[in-house]
Curated annotation (Swiss-Prot):
Quaternary structure annotation from Swiss-Prot or TrEMBL: Part of the 30S ribosomal subunit.
Gene Ontology BP terms: translation
Gene3D superfamilies according to UniProt: Nucleic acid-binding proteins (2.40.50.140)
Pfam family for this entry, one: Ribosomal_S17
Keywords noted in UniProt: Ribonucleoprotein, Ribosomal protein, RNA-binding, rRNA-binding
Any one GO MF annotation of this record: structural constituent of ribosome
Family affiliation: Belongs to the universal ribosomal protein uS17 family.
Higher taxonomy: Bacteria, Bacillati, Bacillota, Bacilli, Bacillales
Protein name: Small ribosomal subunit protein uS17
A Gene Ontology cellular-component term: cytosolic small ribosomal subunit
Protein purpose: One of the primary rRNA binding proteins, it binds specifically to the 5'-end of 16S ribosomal RNA.
Record bears the keyword Lipid metabolism: no
Length: 87
């Protein structure tokens, strides 16, 4: 049980939902520069497994690390935190 709690959990925005059962999530993190103290923004894209194809473009989602599902997928969708507003 403690093993499961050590998995990485990220919150990010869905930037692509064109693949079947797969979404691309953009995760932005901030790190403080060691010498100057300025906060620098880093971003990385992760492919995540979405079994029911429920996440849509622009949604804020939570993803969790899991076993390798394909050559590039290492995360799965946990929940949709906020749905995108389509205008």
């Amino acid at each position: 049980m403690s093993e499961r709690n050590q998995r990485k959990v990220y919150t990010g925005r869905v930037v692509s939902d064109k693949m079947d059962k797969t979404i691309t999530v953009l995760v932005e993190t901030y790190k403080t520069h060691s010498l100057y103290g300025k906060r620098v923004k880093y971003s990385k894209k992760y492919k995540a497994h979405d079994e029911q194809n429920q996440a849509k473009l622009g949604d804020i989602v939570k993803i969790m690390e899991t076993r390798p599902l394909s050559a590039t997928k290492r995360f799965r969708l946990v929940e949709i935190v906020e749905e995108a507003v389509i205008i």
